[in-house]
Regions:
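ATP/Mg2+ or Mg2+-diphosphate-binding catalytic cores
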Residues: 316-360
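Active-site acidic catalytic loop and adjacent metal/ATP-binding pocket
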Residues: 27, 68, 203-263
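Active-site activation/catalytic loop segments of kinase-like enzymes and analogous catalytic loops
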Residues: 263-296, 309-328
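A glycine-centered beta->alpha junction motif in the catalytic cores
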Residues: 86-99, 169-177, 269, 311-329
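ATP-binding pocket architecture of kinase catalytic cores
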Residues: 33-129, 136-148
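ATP-binding glycine-rich phosphate-binding loop
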Residues: 6-29
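ATP-dependent phospho-/nucleotidyl transfer catalytic cores
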Residues: 18, 126-133, 139-223
Length: 360
């Protein structure tokens, strides 16, 4: 163990048996079990709020989370003399959800539904006071930390309008590029088709009930994980009955939690999986059913999911990344992402037709 690591861990009331490095953190074998020491990057203001969320989830019976341990002084983070800030989290013996295994993806979908069932403010509406230091998740007063208004869900209408403007700006720039490379030619060839999808998403949004769904979600105090993907879903190892409980799951890394329409998490998770599986209708339908079996999906939520899937998100992200990068050298990864987005358009079209009865 390095001297600095030892100095950080000495701030906690634990006995350390051994440590080993892992991706961006340090795994610690202790008398309390497996823990993860991680440096806080960026603002630390949300850490006490995050601690409150973890406490709330556990009181609701959702216990398999990477809750934050407090220091000997009762702080949520350990602050070092050199300015470094660290959190010590509960961790689990296990591995990330395997995106190649449908059974694990279905279990992860059901796990998300269980999380959403409990991930609401206990006193009804989500108010800023719940995050800025007056009333906490557990009803206690004045926990530190603040969530700005900009952290609340931005309206999809303004988001899509902005994204479409950005796509037009990228096209204008690409047309002016000389000489053009593989990325530029591919982008221009597919632009009209992809932009049509963006316009269709905006039009579908305008006639949907998504606005009411957002208001109702805020009224009920609905929260989202914010980054529910297979990296943050751990399949736990251990002694238990595999026939009765095939997979035991821990959900980790809630740092991006916020008030939002809860199926935004489902959209994000399902989109990531579908992009890796070529938008296979059967798998997507099974994942939706696995979620809905625990937390039924309303008509408005299905509309919301449809609108989100219509928008060419991967195409926009790739174009945005290109525009913000060094355009003199386009990475092969960006070219590959663009080609994938183009190639999967027909597959996604069939997915939307069969799952949501949407026809462009």
């Amino acid at each position: 163990m390095q001297e600095y690591e030892r100095a950080v861990l000495e701030k906690y009331d634990i006995d350390v048996i051994g440590t080993r490095k892992t991706r961006g953190a340090i795994l610690c074998e202790t008398n309390l079990g497996l823990l993860l020491l991680k440096e806080v990057k960026g603002s630390e203001k949300r850490i006490p709020v995050l601690c409150g969320l973890y406490d709330f989830l556990q009181r609701q019976g959702y216990e398999k989370v990477d809750y934050i341990l407090k220091t000997k002084e009762g702080e949520c983070a350990a602050r070092m003399e050199d300015g470094g800030v660290y959190v010590l989290k509960r961790w689990f013996q296990g591995r990330e959800c395997d995106v190649r295994k449908p059974a694990e993806l279905l279990s992860a979908s059901g796990n998300l539904a269980k999380l959403h069932m409990v991930m609401r403010w206990p006193d009804g509406p989500v108010r800023e006071t719940g995050l800025n230091g007056e009333t906490g998740l557990n009803g206690e007063t004045k926990p530190a930390g603040k969530m700005k208004k900009s952290d609340l869900t931005e309206g999809l209408e303004s988001e899509y309008l902005r994204h479409n403007r950005e796509l037009s700006k990228v096209r204008k720039f690409v047309r002016s590029v000389s000489p053009k490379g593989e990325f530029e030619y591919a982008f221009l060839r597919c632009f009209d088709q992809m932009y049509q999808w963006g316009e269709a998403a905006l039009q579908e949004l305008m006639t949907s009930g998504c606005g009411k769904l957002l208001k109702e979600s805020r009224r009920q105090g609905c929260m989202v994980h914010g980054e529910y993907n297979y990296h943050n879903i751990l399949m736990i190892q251990g002694d238990y009955n595999y026939r009765k409980e095939p997979y035991r799951i821990a959900t980790t890394n809630f740092e991006k939690f916020k008030p939002d329409v809860q199926v935004e998490d489902l959209y994000y998770f399902l989109r990531k999986v579908m992009e890796k599986h070529g938008w296979k209708v059967r798998l997507g339908d099974n994942m939706l059913n696995a979620y809905a079996a625990i937390r039924p999906l309303s008509e408005a939520e299905m509309e919301y999911l449809c609108v989100r899937f219509i928008y060419p998100e991967k195409f926009w992200k790739t174009a945005d990344s290109y525009y913000r990068s060094n355009k003199a050298w386009v990475s092969s990864k960006n070219i590959e992402k663009l080609q994938t987005a183009i190639q999967q358009t027909e597959e996604k079209k069939r997915f939307l037709e069969e799952i949501f009865s949407f026809h462009l």
